[in-house]
Structures are given as C-alpha cells and as structure tokens.
C-alpha cells in the first residue's frame, strides 16, 4: 500500500474559518480545494463539506448577503464541495458598557446574533460519514 493516498473528507466550519483566519485581512475568496491540497498534499480529498448560515443585511453593511451569496455560488462549482446550512438567531439581550457614563445605567440593550446549527450539522455529518465510510 506504499504510495497510496489516504481518502479524506474535510469538514469546515465557515464561521470559525472566517473569524479565525480571514477577518481583518483583504482575503475573502478562499479556494477550498487549493487550501486542502496545500495542507493535505499526501491525501486524496474526496469531499469538502462547508458548514455555514446565510447572513442578513445590516445597516452598516447592506451588501454582506450579496457578497456571501456570490462566494457560495462560486464554491458550489467545485466538484468536491457541498454546502450545509444552519441559521442565525437574533434576540435582544442586556450587556454592560465597557466604559459607562457616570450617573447613567451601565447596561444597554443590544441585538445579539448567533449562528446556530453549524456545529451540530458538522458533528452529525462527520459521524454519519464515518459510519458509511465516505
């Protein structure tokens, strides 16, 4: 079996990839297949599963959904990539101000948006794929 490449599936949490590696850089359009070839040169990557959620427009960035959709359409053209969607959940929470103004409440209400489903989807796909020997 010398020289045989290991058959490999890659599972990517898009939220963690973005905030851990891409946010604050000029890089946005990451070629997932090239990334896998770079980090796994001795493996045969047969599947890349990309776990994400569709973003909503924000007052400070109304074009964010269009940019995300363009990227998702692009990576869908890669033969090994499949996209699995979770969702975002927004709700009002109370948060403490970092520098409260004296004489005013140190608390404000904010809208907190959290990604839901990607972690569970990723774990479920990973276990199922291992079970069926993907």
Regions found by a protein language model. Name each.
Residues 121-128:
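Acidic, metal-associated active-site segment
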Residues 1-114, 118-120:
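Domain-level signal for Mg2+-assisted phosphodiester chemistry and nucleotide/NA-binding surfaces
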Residues 129-134:
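Short, surface-exposed connector motifs at secondary-structure boundaries
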